[in-house]
Each structure stands twice: as C-alpha cells, then as structure tokens.
Amino acid sequence: MASSLTLPMAMAFTLLALSFASAMGGSMNSSRFDELFQPSWAFDHFVYEGEVLKMKLDNYSGAGFSSKGKYLFGKVTVQIKLVEGDSAGTVTAFYMSSDGTNHNEFDFEFLGNTTGEPYLVQTNVYVNGVGNREQRLNLWFDPTKDFHSYSLLWNQRQVVFMVDETPIRVHSNLEHRGIPFPKDQPMGVYSSIWNADDWATQGGRIKTDWSHAPFVASYQGFAIDACECPAAVAATDNARRCSSSAEKQFWWDMPTLSELSLHQSHQLIWVRANHLVYDYCTDTARFPVTPAECEHHRH
C-alpha cells in the first residue's frame, strides 16, 4: 500500500513518536555488543568497527548472535541498518525466543528485495510452540540508509513491536478468553542473517544473486531493560520474581503500559492503514476459520 504521508507530516510524526518514547522505556541506555551478546555461529562473519557490529552473509554461511542472559518481561532494543542494494533472498532477523518444542517467540524478520524495491518487515508470535501469526508491512523510510531502532516491549498484558518507538503491532493478553499468552518462559534475544531465497522475496521467485555478496547488516545501540532469569531458577519462581508486588515494582508493570496510549493507538492505526500488506487474521484462504485471537484483538 502506498503511503499518502507528505514529508513535513512524516517529520512531525517522527517527532511525536520520540516524545512518547519514555512511556515505553524509551530512555534506555545502550551497551556495547559484548556486554550483552555473543556470537553464536560463524564467528568469522563478524566485523567490529568501534560501536558498530557488522554481520555478513556470503555463499558459505550466514551468521548469528545471542544474548548472554535470558529475560522475562521488559524491553529489548537494537538499532539496525539493513543490507543495501540488492538484498533479494536474504533475511535479517531480530527476535526473542525461549527453548524447547513448546517455546514462545516474538519475531522481526526483514525480507530483502531487489534494488529499488522496499524491504518487507514480517512479524510473528509463537505461543506454546504455535506460530502462523504473520503480519507483513513496508516501512515509511529506507531502512538501508541509516540506523533505526527495533524494539520489543513485553509485560503481562501485551507484547508491543516498535520501530523507532512507533508501535507496529500489539499482541494482547486474552487469557480471559481462553487464549494462551506467553508469560512464564524466559527468553533469549537473538539476531541472524541467512539465505532464505526459497520464500523470502516475492514468494521465492527472486533468488539470491551471490555476485552481490557479501550482504552486510550493521548493528549498534544494544539495550536490554528486563528481568534477567538465572538458568537454575524454576519457571514458576522466575514468574514470581519478575512480577511486581507490594515489595517491589517493575516499570513494565505500570498501569499506563497495560495498553497503548491514545496517541500510540493512533500511530498503530496509521501504520496499518498505510503500510500493512499482509495480516494472517484476514487470510481466509489460509485460515477458513478465523484464529481465535483475531476475533478479539482491537489492532
């Protein structure tokens, strides 16, 4: 869908988004890569340039990194500059995931495209090992020209996907409707770049052109403000220690973060109206019976 937003309106929109950043933990301090993360595979495909980390994909391998800790509730953010030029067939991912078959997962997947065509951002939510909740949108800027922040806010009421502090998706807690919600499995934070030309670009019709390799994604501004969960602590104990009580209060349990503010709701409506290109909730060919959460989600 083409956006009708003019440049002055877009600038005003961005300034408004920044003014609301603190409401979603937007004042987080960033850390060096090695304070929070570590390479998880293809160590020779990492390049460090001061505060910037670069991961590359070539016809030998992609690369990936993971957080040193696991977390239950809070906010994670990274600034990414995506692969420039012809990125068809490539996927750069930033996500949170727990372990095991019945895992929970929140995904940003950036689907590359041919030169001049926009990146697609695919988000997905897995709960107890069940995904198939894809949404796709294009962005209101070129994500290959500069760094932009991508964040996940997670509390007991909602999961919010954000781009430059603008919400692009909300997955609400609907347990009162009998719909499971991810709230008891600590998650690691991950990113990777890999070849997915069997599906990533135009349904797999456009393949990766290896003559343009290496494909490089750049990272900076690593930030995690969340409840870290020691591996030796039981899941029920983690859920208790990461939830607010009379003795302790966590910022992510603030009543103002139990749902989007009015302004943030308007932002999300704008994103969906101007940039959403696919929503599993409306894909009746794939889901003849509407998924249960789609009947109740307001966004």
UniProtKB/Swiss-Prot annotation:
It is found in: Secreted, Cell wall; Secreted, Extracellular space, Apoplast. One of its GO terms (cellular component) is apoplast. The record marks D107 as: Important for catalytic activity. Residues 26-219 form the GH16 domain. CDD domains: GH16_XET. Contains at least one intrachain disulfide bond essential for its enzymatic activity. This is Xyloglucan endotransglucosylase protein 6.
